[in-house]
Design a protein with these regions (language model features):
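Glycosyltransferase catalytic domains, chiefly GT-A lineage
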Residues: 1-185
Length: 185
């Protein structure tokens, strides 16, 4: 869907965890902790993979359960170079009775829940330069997903309509991207 919703040519890289592991990029192992899905940690390798291809500017990570309804290039027009990373800053914690998330994984409650599901990385920012293979592979899920690798002033807002989550995002918004956190449509 991403490829159909863009007004300009973009370069997109799609890497599976197995490929990253085989090429020495991703060596952290699944440890049965709640963050341990195949892409929980590897999403934070996007800046490193871009650096290896001599890319600069902005790069995006997006969970695989998104459906884009608008031109993705409009999202890139929202970026601000003063930030290391930009995302939708959800103020949401899963309800106590929601014990499992997609694919039967244990649902955890923590600040910044869902923030890392769509991230725009400023590849030229010094904090992003620290987000490398060694840091990603040796950090805890909490360190990565709570954005402890940058400071709070360096995390910018993206408009909520780019990460519309049913039951979380205001129903008054017209979504530009729908995030199916509980499974596909």
């Amino acid at each position: 869907e991403f490829l159909n919703r863009r007004s300009l040519q973009t370069q997109h890289l799609y890497y599976r965890k197995a490929f990253l592991s085989e090429n020495g990029q991703y060596f952290d192992t699944l440890d049965s902790k709640p963050f341990s899905t195949e892409f929980s940690f590897s999403r934070f390798l996007v800046p490193e993979l871009c650096r290896q291809q001599q890319k600069d500017g902005w790069a995006m990570f997006v969970d695989g359960d998104f459906l884009f309804l608008d031109d993705i290039m409009k999202l890139f027009s929202c970026v601000n170079n003063k930030y290391s990373v930009m995302c939708i800053k959800f103020n949401w914690v899963p309800p106590q009775d929601e014990r499992y998330k997609l694919d039967g994984m244990i649902q955890t409650r923590y600040s910044k829940k869902l923030w890392s599901s769509l991230m725009m990385f400023n590849l030229n920012h010094p904090h992003i330069k620290k987000l490398n293979r060694d840091l990603v592979n040796t950090s805890t899920g909490s360190h990565l997903h709570k954005f402890r690798w940058t400071d709070k002033e360096s995390i910018g807002f993206l408009p909520d309509e780019w990460n519309y989550v049913d039951g979380v995002t205001s129903k008054s918004l017209k979504p530009k991207a729908i995030h199916y956190t509980k499974g596909g449509p």
